[in-house]
C-alpha cells in the first residue's frame, strides 16, 4: 500500500513575493524534496510557485479590512468570510503541520484562525518576522523605545505607524485579544528569526510558549562576488576612482536615510554613496552627491552593486535580522551596522563593525579605516562566513527537522 504523503500548509501575506514570501517558497521546496506535499495560503501578491497556492479573500476584502483598521484600530479582526473559507480549505487539505508567517496585513481574522488551530490540534509553527504578535498595535517599537508590551499595552504612542489607526486607540483590547488567542494553542512553536527577537519574546506574554530561533538564509549561489563591474559603474555614472558606499532597503522608513545624508557631509567626494530601494519622493529629495536607485527585482544588478561597494552601511533604527547584511557579506563586502535589533548578529570581527545608533561620525571613521586596510582584507572572511552560516538550504532545513520532531511527538 502506498504511504500517504505528509502535508505542509503555510500561511503568509504573500506567495513567493518579497522576502517572507520567498522564505515560505524555499521551505516548501525543501519539504517537497523530502517527499511532502506543500501548500501556501496567501493574502495578496504572488509569483508562480512550486507549492499549491490558495488566495485568501480578495482585493476588495483587503481594502475594507484596511479601512476598518485605520478607523477602528481593529487590525486582524475583520475578513471573517475570507478566514472561514480558509478554514474550510485547511479542513479539506488536512495538513500534518501548519506554518504561520506574517498573519497581519489586512487579510485574516486571527481569533477565528487560532480557534481553528486550538480545536484541530495540528502541530503549528509560527515564524516571527517582527514584533506584532505580542504588542497591542505595532510591528516595531524600537524607534520610540516603547516597552509597554512587557506588561500591558495601552495609550499607544505608535498609532501612526503600521498598522496605522487614524482615530481610535484599541491597543489595550488588542493586547487582551492577542493574548487570549495566541495562548490558546497548546501545540504551538514560535520561531523568532534572530536571537534578539527571541529575547523580546521571552519578556512578553508569549514567554512560556515553546521557542526555537532559526535565522533566515539566502541563496549564496546567487549572492556571491561578481566580476566585470565596470558596467554597473557606467550605468550609474560612478567614477572608476571612487569608492562606493552602499545602502539597500525595500522601505526606507526608519532605515537611516537621513543618516546617509549626514554621512555624505562627512566624506569627501572620493566616495560615492549609492542607495537602492528609494521611492519617487525620496529620489526627488536626495541631496547632491548621493546616487539614488528605485527598488529593483534585478538580483544580478544588486549583486554587482554589493560586489562593487567598498562597504555596505546599514544605519537602521528598526530591524530584526536584515537580509541585506547577509547578501552583502556573501558578495565579499564588509558591513557596518547600527546596534539595532538582530542586525549585528550577521557580523563578526572579521566581516564588519557594529556602531551605536546615530553615531554616524564613527561610521565615517570606519569607512576610511576599511579603505586604508583594503576591502581584500575582509572579502575572504566574508565569503567563508556566508558559506558556513547563511546558506538557505541549511537554514530552512532546520524547519523540516522541526516539523519531523513535532509530528513524532
PLM feature segments, named:
Residues 191, 239-255, 261-264:
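Conserved donor-binding/catalytic core segment of Leloir-type glycosyltransferases
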Residues 334-337:
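Short hydrophobic beta-strand element within catalytic cores of glycosyltransferases
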Residues 376-389, 395-401:
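A short, well-ordered alpha-helix in the C-terminal region of glycosyltransferases
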Residues 349, 353-360, 369-374:
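Conserved acidic donor-binding segment of nucleotide-sugar-dependent glycosyltransferases
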Residues 304-309:
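Short alpha-helical donor nucleotide-sugar binding micro-motif in glycosyltransferases
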Residues 317:
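Aromatic "clamp/platform" in nucleotide-sugar-dependent glycosyltransferases that forms part
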